[in-house]
């Protein structure tokens, strides 16, 4: 099977000092000659390291992002970061709607939609996280939840913005974190097919859908070979640069 146009990256959550982030960036830059053109690599550090990581990786094809942002350009939003600020740091991607932010910080489909529109306005690629909880899955509500989240994410896109690059990351809430149980490849692919169909109906273009949720060296190859999975969004298995490079190599061999 041959696949291309895949996205494989990692978000570090609230981890890594600036020094630790630069060790990762240095290791990734040093391995740039071994990159596979079929795979778009990306890393999403904490805010405190994003600019420096971007600068270190500027000569590579690695895209660098932020883990969140506000929808306003500026204003009385103490503690927030605006899309203007992210653009000023020369970042490429912004992660939006992660389940931890939905659960602990009151993110809603509406706020994710506002942020998506703001990101596109400022030339950032939104990486929108969606996923059902265990209770929703067991109640047979997964597909309904995913459809609502996708449509909410795109609700404020208008005109040309509806054709701008966007990414979706399917991260079932029960599959992420230390105690997460990875979705089976079949289950994940079925959800990806639905998500892709809903997104294409909403925007009129194909939207890449990445899988995230306890991705590791043991399951990355089976996952990436599924027909509707367009990439991998990796957690702790890729927080060490060696682990990230290992998964990249496994994916490249598999496709």
From Swiss-Prot:
<feature type="active site" description="Electrophile">
    <location>
        <position position="98"/>
    </location>
</feature>
<keyword id="KW-0570">Pentose shunt</keyword>
<comment type="subunit">
    <text>Homodimer.</text>
</comment>
<dbReference type="GO" id="GO:0006096">
    <property type="term" value="P:glycolytic process"/>
</dbReference>
<comment type="function">
    <text>Catalyzes the isomerization of D-erythrulose-4P to L-erythrulose-1P.</text>
</comment>
<keyword id="KW-0312">Gluconeogenesis</keyword>
<dbReference type="Pfam" id="PF00121">
    <property type="entry name" value="TIM"/>
</dbReference>
<dbReference type="GO" id="GO:0019563">
    <property type="term" value="P:glycerol catabolic process"/>
</dbReference>
<dbReference type="GO" id="GO:0046166">
    <property type="term" value="P:glyceraldehyde-3-phosphate biosynthetic process"/>
</dbReference>
<keyword id="KW-0324">Glycolysis</keyword>
<dbReference type="InterPro" id="IPR013785">
    <property type="entry name" value="Aldolase_TIM"/>
</dbReference>
<protein>
    <recommendedName>
        <fullName>L-erythrulose-1-phosphate isomerase</fullName>
        <ecNumber>5.3.1.33</ecNumber>
    </recommendedName>
</protein>
<feature type="active site" description="Proton acceptor">
    <location>
        <position position="171"/>
    </location>
</feature>
<feature type="binding site">
    <location>
        <position position="177"/>
    </location>
    <ligand>
        <name>substrate</name>
    </ligand>
</feature>
<comment type="pathway">
    <text>Carbohydrate metabolism; erythritol degradation.</text>
</comment>
<dbReference type="GO" id="GO:0005829">
    <property type="term" value="C:cytosol"/>
</dbReference>
<dbReference type="GO" id="GO:0006094">
    <property type="term" value="P:gluconeogenesis"/>
</dbReference>
<comment type="similarity">
    <text>Belongs to the triosephosphate isomerase family.</text>
</comment>
<keyword id="KW-0963">Cytoplasm</keyword>
<dbReference type="InterPro" id="IPR020861">
    <property type="entry name" value="Triosephosphate_isomerase_AS"/>
</dbReference>
<dbReference type="GO" id="GO:0004807">
    <property type="term" value="F:triose-phosphate isomerase activity"/>
</dbReference>
<keyword id="KW-0413">Isomerase</keyword>
<dbReference type="InterPro" id="IPR035990">
    <property type="entry name" value="TIM_sf"/>
</dbReference>
<dbReference type="GO" id="GO:0006098">
    <property type="term" value="P:pentose-phosphate shunt"/>
</dbReference>
<dbReference type="InterPro" id="IPR000652">
    <property type="entry name" value="Triosephosphate_isomerase"/>
</dbReference>
<feature type="binding site">
    <location>
        <position position="214"/>
    </location>
    <ligand>
        <name>substrate</name>
    </ligand>
</feature>
